[in-house]
Amino acid sequence: MVERARRLGRWFLALDSLLVILGFFVVMPMISLRFVDQLGWAAGVVGLALGLRQLTQQGLGILGGSLADKFGARPLIVGGMLLRAAGFASLAYAQSGLELILSCVISGLGGCLFDPPRAALVIKFTRPRQRGRYISLLMMLESAGAVVGALLGSWLLNFDFEYVCLLGAGLFVCAALCNLLILPAYKLSVRPTPIRAGLGQVLADKAFCRLVLILSGYYALWVQVMLIFPILVKQMAGTTTAVGWMYTLETAISLALLYPLARYGERHFKLESRLMAGVLLMTTGIGLVAFANTLPAVFMLLACFYLGIVIAEPARETLMTKLAQPGARGSYMGFSRLGLALGGMTGYVGGGALHDYAMLQGQPWLPWLVLGTVGVTTLLLLVNCFHREPSLARVNI
């Protein structure tokens, strides 16, 4: 692929990511506020719906990646985005737990189709040495989109949840049209790969599979910014606008620190060291919320948590792209989402159930201490994994 095509591809992916992240954050943080805070549903039910979306999207990601290896990126991306739009639109009319779950699963099915090929296009459009920096820039752009989306969603929620869902759906329709009209019919792998062969190649890579499964603990922490963090902030502040402040804080940290920290980390630290340092900060931030009694204290700990994500996520994504084999890129990037599937499902369902139990027992600190324990366990498993599998460290060379 000539350099001009790579450069244009990177620009297109950046703009596409902005539309996708706007559509996602307009809707997703508002679901727990709408159904738990406004309608009084059990957080466990809402957590189950969100967890099933996560499990569907990421758990079937390897299938979406394998299909993309065989048929190319564009049909999977366009179809997946339209399916996500349908799921978001149907959320507006969900009147029962079953309807909420169905809407979330439809949304997740869309994501399992478009997410792996988009991740594989990052590999196609970047050279190895520039990949980490490009991923960091994408994350900065996505952070800005997240805060704009969350602010729009929280503002529209004051009027009608239907407006929230239809705006999110409309943004995904726009993204689908852009991909249909602009994105060339790229193949993702160096050669067309049969679905079974791609899956087999990934599953034979035991070190990669082990790392992906361990990272489910990282994601169990990460998804709380969609579930119990918004509930806590809304309860302490007394206004849904405060949820937008959460994402403003995340964006400020990302824009100020993500790229310089990624560049500094590339020069001075290995990928696994950066990943583990980020998990440590996330664990500290989420665990100490158990002892925070004021909104400023919660936001200070959120800042620590977000800083951990800023350090860990570029390293994690770069590590996954470097471990992906050229003959099955889509399959590798699809399987890499399995940790998010398992961790997201566990985090959503467990976080929601813990929140309900803690409120009933008058123990609001309980979910945060349990999540802190999950973070410590994940960190110890990562240390052991990188020690046992030196092949995972050699990708830094």
From Swiss-Prot:
Topology of this chain in the membrane: Multi-pass membrane protein
Classification via InterPro entries: MFS, MFS_dom, MFS_trans_sf, MFS_Transporters, Multidrug-R_MdtH
An example Gene Ontology CC term for this record: plasma membrane
Subcellular location per the Swiss-Prot or TrEMBL entry: Cell inner membrane
Disulfide linkage: none
PANTHER family: MULTIDRUG RESISTANCE PROTEIN MDTH, RESISTANCE PROTEIN MDTM, PUTATIVE-RELATED-RELATED
HAMAP family per record: MFS_MdtH
UniProt-recorded name of the protein: Multidrug resistance protein MdtH
Organism: Aeromonas hydrophila subsp. hydrophila (strain ATCC 7966 / DSM 30187 / BCRC 13018 / CCUG 14551 / JCM 1027 / KCTC 2358 / NCIMB 9240 / NCTC 8049)
Lineage: Bacteria, Pseudomonadati, Pseudomonadota, Gammaproteobacteria, Aeromonadales
